[in-house]
Amino acid sequence: MEEQQPEPKSQRDSALGAAAAATPGGLSLSLSPGASGSSGSGSDGDSVPVSPQPAPPSPPAAPCLPPLAHHPHLPPHPPPPPPQHLAAPAHQPQPAAQLHRTTNFFIDNILRPDFGCKKEQPPPQLLVAAAARGGAGGGGRVERDRGQTAAGRDPVHPLGTRAPGAASLLCAPDANCGPPDGSQPAAAGAGASKAGNPAAAAAAAAAAVAAAAAAAAAKPSDTGGGGSGGGAGSPGAQGTKYPEHGNPAILLMGSANGGPVVKTDSQQPLVWPAWVYCTRYSDRPSSGPRTRKLKKKKNEKEDKRPRTAFTAEQLQRLKAEFQANRYITEQRRQTLAQELSLNESQIKIWFQNKRAKIKKATGIKNGLALHLMAQGLYNHSTTTVQDKDESE
């Protein structure tokens, strides 16, 4: 095998030169004689996508690629590395993909409690496939929308959930949608070249082979095929994606099937909305009084004591007792209260008032007051009326 390799290289060079001279605007593919023979081992040198060159011809050695050695532990169709002159233009269509990027969530996902949480990153092969489909033009967007529809509109993992049902988009090795020996990359490259982007043809072909290998690896997890793929094919993954009993205090809206979860009062306390805590006049108990509480009426004991109306006999006995002793004793007060049918407090207050009147009538208070009264500067002497005193 090592001695026969230079001959396919020379044949490939001549075939590429003839194809470039005949059709400069088309896409030329060359197959080695080993691929059409009986020893078709499916190696990497079977199909090599080459980007078309403009009107001026390029050197014949530039588009040539050396065949890679076959490893039995690799997938049947690993992605061939792009040439050096195609690696730089392959990253140019990404700004266009960012401008026409569609939203990857719906309104039912916003209501789920785990919306916005960081998810695990998809495989790098799927990221390359997504970038290639985004740069391929309108066809890439159609395939992306079709993948979301086939995945049951579950956009939490827009790339990860597409892998089990990738047979509807990309041909897996065990599917019946076409021969896996290079016709699928050729079709993808032709579609990209018709769209007017020849630089993305090789990248799209390589990404298609990588996505097909990833779909073949993830095929045993979904036995329903590509039509029923997505998150609905694997209930285990769906359960881990949206745990139903992860946090009962947060899972108020949304469950595994998207319906509302009804929580009773025994399971969870009443949760007030956010606006309740921003206003005072609400229905919560701690909002404060809306009306002023009425003042408690004072009891009759706290009211002012009514004026006591003494009889003539009572006033005569009190004045006689005051003449005998201006300060009545407790024992004498109790005896007088029983004789006159009065309270002890009434007798005590009458004696206090009588002493205050006499003190005010005499005007003898202190030395300073006497000195001022002698100079005529302090004269507060009052005349008492006997009738008023007797009535009291």
UniProtKB/Swiss-Prot annotation:
It comes from the Eukaryota. SMART domains: HOX. The keyword Nucleus applies. Residues 1-100, 132-164, 219-251, 282-306 are annotated as: Disordered. Residues 223-236 have a biased composition (Gly residues). Residues 303-362 bind DNA. Gene3D superfamilies: Homeodomain-like. Residues 14-36, 85-100 have a biased composition (Low complexity). GO terms for cellular component: chromatin; nucleus. CDD domains: homeodomain (cd00086). It is found in: Nucleus. InterPro entries: Engrailed_Homeobox_TFs (IPR050720), HD (IPR001356), HD_engrailed (IPR000747), HD_metazoa (IPR020479), Homeobox-engrailed_C-terminal (IPR019549), Homeobox-engrailed_CS (IPR019737), Homeobox_CS (IPR017970), Homeodomain-like_sf (IPR009057). The keyword RNA-binding does not apply. GO terms for biological process: adult locomotory behavior; anatomical structure morphogenesis; central nervous system neuron differentiation; cerebellum development; dopaminergic neuron differentiation; dorsal/ventral pattern formation; drinking behavior; embryonic brain development. One of its GO terms (molecular function) is DNA-binding transcription repressor activity, RNA polymerase II-specific. Its main location: nucleus. Residues 51-66, 75-84 have a biased composition (Pro residues). Keywords: Developmental protein, DNA-binding, Dwarfism, Homeobox, Nucleus. PANTHER family: HOMEOBOX PROTEIN ENGRAILED, HOMEOBOX PROTEIN ENGRAILED-1. It is linked to ENDOVE syndrome, limb-only type: An autosomal recessive disorder characterized by severe shortening and deformation of the legs and feet, 3/4 syndactyly of the hands, and toenails partially displaced to plantar surface. Radiographs show normal femora but severely shortened tibiae, triangular fibulae and malformed or absent bones in the feet. In addition, genitourinary anomalies have been observed. Belongs to the engrailed homeobox family. Required for proper formation of the apical ectodermal ridge and correct dorsal-ventral patterning in the limb. This is Homeobox protein engrailed-1. It comes from Homo sapiens. The gene is EN1.
